[in-house]
UniProtKB/Swiss-Prot annotation:
Taxonomic lineage of the native organism: Eukaryota, Viridiplantae, Streptophyta, Embryophyta, Tracheophyta
Gene from which the chain derives: rps8
Single Gene Ontology BP annotation: translation
Protein name: Small ribosomal subunit protein uS8c
Gene Ontology terms for molecular function: rRNA binding; structural constituent of ribosome
HAMAP family: Ribosomal_uS8_B
Length: 134
């Protein structure tokens, strides 16, 4: 059985957010690079750096937390994996759901690459729903 790299990314980010850590390290692949760029553009990360250590590439993500006097507050409320290796979920462009009335973001793998639900609706293409983030 292969590794589900998308589930590993989601789990790493969720665990760091729940533990209120500011920095997360994830393995670097083409899929993770595209997903990280999207989430950075959507404002879920403050900074992304690519590092190489022992001939292995990885990303160092700085999570965006709101400041409080006692401790940082969580910013990411929920990450949910939808399509998985055992059950793929596909939607046409007209049927792509809206999360929290458009406040959440859906990451979709399309024939034109990985993009958000808004971009897929604008281009009129559907695809595989990878995960929700809100």
């Amino acid at each position: 059985m292969g590794r589900d790299t998308i589930a590993e990314i989601i789990t790493s980010i969720r665990n760091a957010d729940m533990d209120r850590k500011r920095v997360v390290r994830i393995a670097s692949t083409h899929i993770t690079e595209n997903i990280v760029k999207l989430l950075l553009r959507e404002g879920f990360f403050e900074n992304v750096r690519k590092h190489r250590e022992n001939n292995k590439n990885f990303f160092v993500l700085t999570l965006r937390h709101r400041r409080n006097k006692k401790r940082p507050l969580r910013n990411i409320l929920k990450l949910k994996r939808i399509s998985r290796p055992g059950l793929r979920i596909y939607y046409k462009s007209q049927k792509i759901p809206r999360i929290l009335g458009g406040m959440g973001v859906i990451i979709i793998s399309t024939s034109r690459g990985i993009m958000t639900d808004r971009e897929a609706r604008l281009e009129g293409i559907g695809g595989e729903i990878l995960f929700y983030i809100w």
